[in-house]
């Protein structure tokens, strides 16, 4: 396996670790509605950071974006909005199916859809079937899916042992939302694929290869921001027990602390895709669809490890932890299989 591929896998791991940890600061926010907290974090992660970093990278910010016609920018924006819809459905999936089953189904679907639909859309699916490297990467995707399933099973065992149930369990509604969430969340993968002309234009301007995807985030995350912030603002305006005024009527020190914690959560959320861009840049172009599989499977892996470190599994018993450990090992094996496939 070449150093470039190894580093690509490593950066995807770092990005996924940030994704697995980003909600920790949000959990420390006190006496604020979820909508206010999520909006502050979202403004940082979807608007401030993409625009600021792009302004630092590009020699002429406005000239870069104005060089693209609507037929290039619109699909990128709409796929970003598609991801935003999946993101909103994610929380509802947890409500109706519970954390483990909801995550397992949603992540499993988005892993498959986001990974395999890209080469199909590009007319390159034959590379998966007719080449040794393609078949090996396809095997890696399958093994990763098995790993996600094992981790999901561990979570179910943990919830059963600790008496944790879904907030409003509804299998039919939950499964429908999980499928929608999985499909729509793959919009981020499709957006990265649609943004290739933007990456190439950034490279032509002399932007370092590690950073060429970052300017496209202004458009991708702009689409996601429209959906997420729109959802939050509508709820803040219409739901009687939610109020921005009430959230900002707390003691000044608490308001500042909540803003800083929400901003930190937003920063950590953004860093997952900052390092995703680094990892994506190191993956061979013919296998760039594998970036999504690496990100999502590592997200599950890191989520399990973070849970162990934070002692969330302390009272779960030995069996759930053993099953979780097995799932993590399977995901690591999947990453190695994919790496060898890309190197062959």
Swiss-Prot record:
What phylogenetic lineage does the species belong to?
Bacteria, Pseudomonadati, Pseudomonadota, Gammaproteobacteria, Enterobacterales
What family is this protein classified in? Belongs to the L-rhamnose transporter (TC 2.A.7.6) family.
Q: Which UniProt keywords apply?
A: Cell inner membrane, Cell membrane, Membrane, Sugar transport, Symport, Transmembrane, Transmembrane helix, Transport
Respond yes or no to whether keyword Cell inner membrane is given for this record: yes
Gene Ontology CC terms:
plasma membrane
Q: Which Pfam families match?
A: RhaT
Q: What is its main location?
A: membrane
What's the protein here called? L-rhamnose-proton symporter
Q: State the superkingdom.
A: Bacteria
| Keyword Signal tagged | no
Encoding gene per record:
rhaT
**Catalysed reaction equations from the record:** L-rhamnopyranose(in) + H(+)(in) = L-rhamnopyranose(out) + H(+)(out)
The membrane spanning regions, by residue number, are 4-24, 38-58, 68-88, 101-121, 137-157, 175-195, 214-234, 259-279, 290-310, 323-343
InterPro entries given in the database record: L-rhamnose-proton_sym_RhaT (IPR004673)
Q: What does this protein do?
A: Uptake of L-rhamnose across the cytoplasmic membrane with the concomitant transport of protons into the cell (symport system).
**Annotated Gene Ontology MF terms?**
rhamnose transmembrane transporter activity; symporter activity
Q: How does it sit in the membrane?
A: Multi-pass membrane protein
Q: Where in the cell is it found?
A: Cell inner membrane
């Amino acid at each position: 396996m070449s150093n470039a591929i190894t580093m690509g896998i490593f950066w995807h791991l770092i990005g996924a670790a940030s994704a697995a940890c980003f909600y920790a600061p949000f959990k420390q926010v006190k006496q604020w509605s979820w909508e206010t907290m999520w909006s502050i974090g979202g403004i940082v992660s979807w608007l401030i950071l993409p625009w600021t970093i792009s302004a630092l990278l590009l020699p002429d910010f406005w000239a870069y974006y104005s060089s693209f016609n609507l037929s290039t920018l619109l699909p990128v924006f709409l796929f970003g909005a598609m991801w935003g819809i999946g993101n909103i459905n994610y929380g509802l999936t947890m409500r109706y199916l519970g954390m483990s089953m909801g995550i397992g189904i949603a992540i499993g679907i988005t892993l498959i859809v986001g990974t395999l639909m890209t080469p199909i859309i590009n007319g390159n699916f034959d590379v998966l079937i007719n080449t040794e490297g393609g078949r090996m990467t396809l095997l890696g995707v399958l093994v990763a899916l098995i790993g996600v399933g094992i981790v999901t099973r561990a979570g179910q065992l943990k919830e059963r042992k600790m008496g944790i149930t879904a907030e409003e369990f509804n299998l039919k509604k939950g499964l429908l939302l999980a499928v929608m969430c999985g499909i729509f969340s793959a919009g981020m993968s499709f957006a990265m694929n649609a943004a290739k002309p933007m990456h190439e234009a950034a490279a032509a301007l002399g932007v370092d290869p590690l950073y060429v995807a970052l300017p496209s985030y202004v458009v991708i995350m702009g689409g996601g921001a429209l959906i997420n912030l729109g959802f939050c603002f509508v709820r803040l305006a219409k739901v009687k027990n939610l109020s921005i005024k009430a959230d900002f009527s707390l003691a000044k020190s608490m308001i500042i602390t909540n803003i800083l914690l929400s901003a930190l959560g937003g920063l950590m959320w953004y860093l997952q895709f900052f390092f995703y861009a680094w990892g994506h840049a190191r993956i061979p172009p013919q296998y760039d669809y594998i970036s999504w599989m690496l990100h999502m499977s590592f997200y599950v892996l890191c989520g399990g490890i973070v849970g162990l470190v934070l002692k969330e599994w302390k009272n779960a018993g030995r069996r759930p932890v053993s099953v979780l450990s097995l799932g993590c090992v399977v995901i690591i094996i999947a990453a190695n299989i994919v790496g060898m496939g890309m190197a062959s």
